[in-house]
């Protein structure tokens, strides 16, 4: 059939019309009902920057980065340049760190390196002529987990040894990697020293090498490969990297001065003490003779003087430029710096008698209370109670503020009521009415439910009372609604047990005095270091330390440390075991209320209760602390809920009294454990947050009762208290229920602690009546941990 054609099997629609500009009607339909939002500005006019100015600024920043890099490289250059510190850490047992070192040095073809010297020492200096570089090699004690952390702490490079035969143990080798990552690691390299044990031919070694590279990249994604030290080219590349690459910095470590001792000597100046002489090269921001130093496992000490043996390359350049200025030249050529009257003391607390007790309420005494404290004040006899202002939105006038009620502002005050606040009020009333009707039908004639308000109250016999109480508590244990719930024994007085607790309308909006009068507060509370603004103070102190440094990075010095004679027996040969000295910043030896962020270690599944002794390593210190755990929330009044346990998968705040740290260093929490392969159990990790004495921790206690009889909104409650005087004492504290109702105690009934309560709606028989009480938890002092 000529001219016949079939329909296309593909349907292609026409292109939609795309106008260049939308019509007015389309724009109206698009923006219908929307209100134009005024832009929020800073109040400053926008400064127009031309393209040429932007290019010039970028050029200046690039030039400054290059200049900083050149200055940092000068630290390690030259004959007297500082040695790069290399720590060798094998991750498996079948590797010998000395074998790794021997294969690295062998490729240098340097006859000046003595292998016998390598075999006899664990810490030594090596000069690589081929790359004109100095290296300080540290081989840690692989049986001591903390010594590995200490050696990696001062290292510029960490060389991780991997095995082609043995897998990395999750309980030891992998924990080393994770701990070093959390502590802070400068630069790292992965090497394999026994790949030939897999197979003699290289092509059969490839799979194992790729598997190890994948494993290493899992922890260090920026590292593309691991090196086979049995190949001379790979070993040479590793050595070249160690000698020529500029190591990354660790902020918290490099913001203080530190020295790895080459020589240690003691000069006796009195029968009980003398000068511990440390010789080494300065790293970090430097030292000042008026500041204290810290020696791990020994403590804090004062400096008597600092002697310079040789200048750093940076300082020699500065001296050369200042040769025309005689005064500056004289200061720069000074080689001995002695401490003076302005040096820091070793006092951890402020002297006694300097406390300021003006903030304390002298009239307040717990023994003078006639009822429970509510909203941060106690009802004292003959004392006027000041009215508190309600929190209102910003910009509200005094007249408008009168219309804001406390119950409206604090509607979300209780954590248990949050899950029900979104429910519709009408539906809640209908449900309650239906529930009450259903209960009344089911228990018709039951003596436990009283419909008549004027029906007489009958007390149960002691045996029946005990039986019903036992049944109620057995049922309660099956479904605990409130984690902070406490139970009172029938013979126990609620007044005596909960006398220091108070009621609050809203925990995060209350007015809680920081320096309140409390017999349970630490004796040294008013003598602690108090910092108004931690962040600004930290920046100022670090800046001042850099400017006041008398010995800077690269200087070779002798430090004369005032040292007691009885500690000499603990000092070991610095060529066999790492001996490091760290400079302390101003005020860092003083105790303060410090806060750590804390997250549980993934592999640790044991409970960690508050106030249990644990060891924390933060920065250069290790302390045994008894931390108080709290929620890491940001509350406007700096009052936070105390937590009894460290919960998994959450970040908590640990509070204690310990020396302050101005470098915001990472923290590792652990417990000594002789049965563990590492001799310690890693509990958690975090960061030093701040030093804040105004952070208040409130421990919550929830008393629960059983709704016993109902009449409209009046309910008879039992099992919350067991004495009528307890009911009268806590009568001022509001009540709440698990369904979101709120109420108050109306009157006490009988002698067994029953009481009538009025609520803002009807309750059901399945409801639980509760009362929240709060008590201040005070941080506890800490002690240095010496590894025992």
UniProtKB/Swiss-Prot annotation:
Annotated segments matching region Disordered: 1-57
PROSITE patterns in the cross-refs: G_BMS1
Lineage: superkingdom: Eukaryota
Broad class of the protein's primary localization: cytoplasm
Subunit structure, as described in the record: Interacts with RIO2.
Stated role: Required for 40S ribosomal subunit synthesis. Required for normal export of the pre-40S particles from the nucleus to the cytoplasm. Its subcellular location and association with pre-40S subunitshifts from mixed cytoplasm/nucleus to all nuclear in RPS19 disruptions, suggesting it acts after the ribosomal protein.
Family recorded in the similarity comment: Belongs to the TRAFAC class translation factor GTPase superfamily. Bms1-like GTPase family. TSR1 subfamily.
Record's protein name: Ribosome biogenesis protein TSR1
Organism, scientific name: Saccharomyces cerevisiae (strain ATCC 204508 / S288c) (Baker's yeast)
